Amino acid sequence: MKNYEQIKNYAKKCISGEIISCKKHKWACERFLRDAEKFETDPEYPYYWNEEAAQSIVDWFALLRHSKGILAGKPILLTEWQRFRICQLYGWRKKKNGMRRFKKAFTEVARKNAKSQEEAGIALYEISVTATKNREVCEVYTAGVKRDQSKIVFNEADLMLRGSPLRKKFDVTKVMITHTKTGSFIKPLSKEDGKSGDGTNPAALIVDEYHQHPTTEFYDLGLGANTKEPLLMIITTAGVDLTYPCYTMEYTYCSRILDPFSDVEDEEYLVDICEMDTEDYGDLERLGNEELWHKANPIRMTYEDGQDKIRGEYKIAKEIPEHMTAFLTKCLNVWVQAQENGYMDMAKWKACQVDEIPINTKGMSVYVGFDM
């Protein structure tokens, strides 16, 4: 079965509930099916599906190797959830020139769901296949606040090449991975190193764990003006500071892109959010429903060791309130505002929102208090 049909079937299963999914992931599935219908029925629709391009990225990952765990050394076979997003990134094309439809991609999911592996595989693909196809030198940067963070994706790319038949196509040093044929390369950037990206010309920028970035410094680097197929890629987990741009800007904006009742449209931004729904973490009893953990863990909840580790984190969080914030953010991909000895329950916070003030306040005095 072709990737296109597989993705359509997957999307329908998520929407129907056959595959446990959160509201926003269902919205992402609905968005794909709407696009598919336009492609199939509307000759004026500006995008088309390129099955060969979609299969190419699937085959690419199969040539790379798992770097750790019980699958270490084995080919990377993309899961249904990974195909749903990655095949869309490369499969949807512009009719006017055949180039990629999506210039930006945002994925938010709980930890240990192969985020770094995905970013690394795509980075290697960009400096090899995409650079060769477009006959250009592609500069790809992995950006992180800390030095160690910026090198996570870089190091993962190195490890995934070990034992791979693709290894001979690349020159790997401690600071750069170079595709020998095109001269394209991957480099890590970090604020801690004093490398802000000034003077770079990125064809692709991978912002890792954006929830930790206090500013949009790397996000604002911009992509190379002369690049034929630029790509800004963000894969992150929820964080503990609601004033950071990942929450105030990206998560909020991307949620509106997915929301079918929103007037926000961005046809060149691929978005997927896998999180616990607000009604799922309002009380401990529902929070402990392991079936619901699948919503934020489309990969980790599919194998026993992953389930056991989330289960263990939950037991600790129940007994020690100080650990609840970490459990919600890292294991269930829920945004919280961290406080000393606790957390702000965002479900209750959002429940306070009203679209219209229920009483007539005209002429009334208003008093505002601040707890500094």
Regions found by a protein language model. Name each.
Residues K2-F370:
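Phosphate/NTP-binding elements of NTP-utilizing enzymes
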